[in-house]
Regions:
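Conformational coupling and interaction surfaces
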Residues: 14-21, 25, 33-148
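Class I SAM-dependent methyltransferase SAM-binding "motif I" and its flanking Rossmann-like core
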Residues: 1-11
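Histidine/acidic residue-rich metal-binding segments in metalloenzymes
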Residues: 28
Length: 148
């Protein structure tokens, strides 16, 4: 992951803001990169407490454990019982597992500027840019795997 969707006014996400210089190296060195933008793309892979409870409770010991830990964390953080949360890290693994989970395209590698905006240089190498998460398909697969 890294940065936000290109339509956002900045690329200032949790990971990129930690070290813009590192993001510039990773995106500028020419290695194969898959960008899963946070806000505007991966943020769409959001689930609510109610959905998690409905689809996962009682399906397996692992799913019950994950729910208990996640619920305790979110209630401590959000200070309320009703919440929704993007499952950021699931999408990175999903991209590796099956192309049906998301849609991507080749784009020139963005330049992470120090003002937290993307720079554009059409001479740069291409990266894979994920622009859409197939939320329902990915959740269906995740729930089936966690129920085993």
């Amino acid at each position: 992951m890294g940065g936000h969707g290109k339509e956002w006014q900045s690329c200032k996400d949790f990971n990129a803001v930690q070290d813009i210089a590192a993001a510039r190296v990773v995106f500028g060195c020419g290695v194969a990169v898959v960008q899963l933008p946070c806000n505007g793309v991966v943020s769409e892979f959001r689930i609510s407490r109610v959905e998690l409870e409905y689809y996962m409770r009682g399906k397996s010991k692992l799913s019950d454990y994950l729910l208990d830990v996640s619920f305790a964390f979110m209630e401590q953080r959000e200070k309320k019982k009703d919440w929704s949360k993007p499952l950021w890290d699931v999408t990175a693994v999903a991209w590796l597992l099956d192309e049906k989970f998301m849609e991507d395209r080749y784009e020139h590698s963005p330049v992470f500027e120090y003002d937290n905006c993307y720079g554009v240089d059409l001479r740069r190498h291409f990266i894979k840019y994920v622009y859409h998460i197939n939320r329902d398909i990915l959740f269906e697969d995740m729930f089936a795997k966690l129920a085993k």
